[in-house]
Structures are given as C-alpha cells and as structure tokens.
Amino acid sequence: MTIDWDSILSYNTIKVVRIRDRRLGILHLCFLIVIVLYVVVYSAIIKKGYVTTEEPVGSIRTSLLAPDELKSNQAYCKNNTEPYPYEKLDCVYYDEKLALFPIGDDVGFTASTRMRISDQTVNCSLMNPSCKFYTNTSMNVYLADIESFTVLIDHTMYAPSSQIQFNGDDLSGYVLDQNGNEIQLNESVNTIGVQGKPDILQLGKLLEFAGVDLDGPSLVNSSNSIRYDGCVLFVFIEYSNTFSYDLKKIKYVYSIKKVDDTAYDVPEVIILNNENSRLYYKRHAIRLIFIQTGVIGSFNFQSLLLTLVSGLGLLTVSTLIVDQLAIRFLPQRKSYSSLKFQTTESFRMKKKIVNDDGEDKLYHNIEAL
C-alpha cells in the first residue's frame, strides 16, 4: 500500500472568496462596527486603554494648633448647670502641646478629649519585683473645646514607575461630605484643596465629615459619650489623574470614616523628681489614621498595543462565525463550502511541470474546479 504523503502532510492556507450575499455582508459589517466601537471608542478612549496605572506612595506631616481663645462654660463641664446626657467632669484649658500625644507620629494623629491624671509614688525599691506604684490622688477631666483646635495636614505623593511627585499644596483637592459629595473649602479657618494653601481643618469639621458627634453615644458603651471614651477615624487621601483625559491634572480627595465598635486611649508617664514619683496620664482621644492611596496613570504604548491586538482577535472570531453560518446553515451552504475549500493536485503532478506551458495548463485546471 502506497502512502500518500502529500495528503498526510498537506498544508492549509487562507483563501479569500468574495461571497455576494447581502445577509452575510450585513452581519459581518455589523460585527465590524461593534468591534471598532468597542476597541477604539470604549476600550482605548473611554477606558483609557493607552494608560498604565500604579498606586502611589506618600508621606504625611501633621500639627495641631489651639485657637486664640477657648470657649468656656461648655455643657459637659461641671461649672455649667445646663443638663447634659452624660457624665460631667471638670474642664481644663490646654494648648496644643498638652493636648497632642504622642508627638511625632508619622502615620497618625491623636488629640485628647479626656484624661485621668494620677499622682503616683512608690515607697520601695524598684529592684524588688513586688514593689508597686500607688495612686495618691486622681483627677478625671475633659479637655475643653477640643473641636475648635485645627489640624494642619501636609502630604506628599510619589508614583515610582512614572516618577510623578507632588506636594499637596501644588494640587487641587476635595473632601467628601456625609452625602458623598466632593467639596472644596476656602474659609477663614478651614482650607482644603486650594492650590498654594496648606490643608487646615478644624477637628469639629473633620468629625462632622465623618458623621461623629463627640457628645453622642460612645461606639463601645452607650452610657458614655464619644468625648469620654474616644474614637478612631480613618482618613483616606486618594490621588488620581485618570478622571480626565489630561494626565497632567492630578487631584486628591479626603474621605473620613469612623471605625465602629472602637474607643481609644493611650498611656503617658511623666517622671517627677525621681523614678519613685510620677504622673500617670490615661488619655482618651480622637485618633486619626492616615491612609494614602489612589491610581496614577501614564501613557504606555504596550498597553495601547494590547488593546488594539485584542480587537484583531475579535475580528477573527467574527469572521469565523460568519464563515460557519455560510457553510453550515444557509441553504447555499454546499456552494459556499465548495468555493471556500479547495484541494490542489498532488505534488507528484506538479513535478511534471517543467515550463510555463505546463503551469498554465495546471492553472486552467484549477480555475475549472
């Protein structure tokens, strides 16, 4: 039995056949229009398929400043005779240096709302493991008018791959209110997102954006106020330059979220005359944790190329669908199939062709198929 290697090792090539059938032509044209709209308009333009994105990193510096004049006789202070739904305490009028602790925190910020101050001494050697400090006197106080203190937020962002770097003063910015609207503040005290000005926000305004009322119920114990127990807030700073087609325009947006079911307190110890005498501060506070995030985009030719190549794949699929419809489902499928698929003569026959006359004869035979 002779093996026909020409049939076994046959090569399939592409043949272009123009089928004059309006049904197939309209279908293929519709596919083509949809693919062009998807690839060019949606993927490349609307979805910015020419852009590669990355998440920026950054740094935060904060500082606290007390107002020129603190409000006295607040409802939560003992010297105020008006009713208050929670426990009243004596009020102290501290400046920013005493209200802020810990100092130098590069990822967060803490402003005290209540402190329990204990005068403690020890009458034995601290080298003795059973030696303990004893509290002589204790005082529980509110820090009055902490809402009027202002916090300055100096932030910087950097995108490593595109090497885009800006300070917050150079950018336009916004803060989300409780309804999720982006607003820009340019008031006498509160300034957010104004180019050339630092971001400054009163703690009371910041709490308002988070939906927090210091004189509302505590997040862990409804019998206390948030002022009494403290709270934790996430302050997200989201950077973006993909909101428009101009990648040189960068904005940032603050969004402030409270952490449910949390209180906050931090201890502070001040040594007095010697290590046997100390002041112990248990501070309850507003704890702000800053998180810098976002999406920074830059032009990338490879991203654009991948977007366009995906369109070529869709064109191939659409052509395959129309071809299968033509050769398998239409009434003229046998005719269309015979036009699309054609088998040449064996290579043995071609070896007999030694001049142009033989090639012309083979060509006419193929045309007659």
Curated annotation (Swiss-Prot):
One of its GO terms (molecular function) is ATP binding. Pfam families: P2X_receptor. Residues 283-296 are annotated as: Pore-forming motif. Keywords: Ion channel, Ion transport, Ligand-gated ion channel, Membrane, Receptor, Transmembrane, Transmembrane helix, Transport, Vacuole. The keyword Transport applies. Disruption phenotype: Null cells are still capable of osmoregulation and do not show any noticeable differences in their sensitivity to hypotonic conditions. Quintuple p2xA/p2xB/p2XC/p2xd/p2xE null cells exhibit a slight delay in their osmoregulatory response, but are still capable of regulating their cell volume in water. Extracellular purinergic response to ATP persists in the quintuple null cells and p2xB null cells with no alteration in the kinetics of the response, but the magnitude of the response is lower. The chain crosses the membrane at residues 26-46. Residues 1-25 are cytoplasmic. Its main location: membrane. Residues 47-369 are lumenal. One of its GO terms (biological process) is calcium ion transmembrane transport. GO terms for cellular component: contractile vacuolar membrane. Gene3D superfamilies: atp-gated p2x4 ion channel. It is found in: Contractile vacuole membrane. Belongs to the P2X receptor family. P2X receptors are ATP-gated ion channels that play a role in intracellular calcium signaling. Not required for the purinergic response to extracellular nucleotides. Not essential for osmoregulation. Inward currents are evoked by intracellular ATP and ATP analogs. Insensitive to the P2 receptor antagonists PPADS and suramin, and also copper ions. Inhibited by sodium ions. Permeable to chloride ions. This is P2X receptor B.
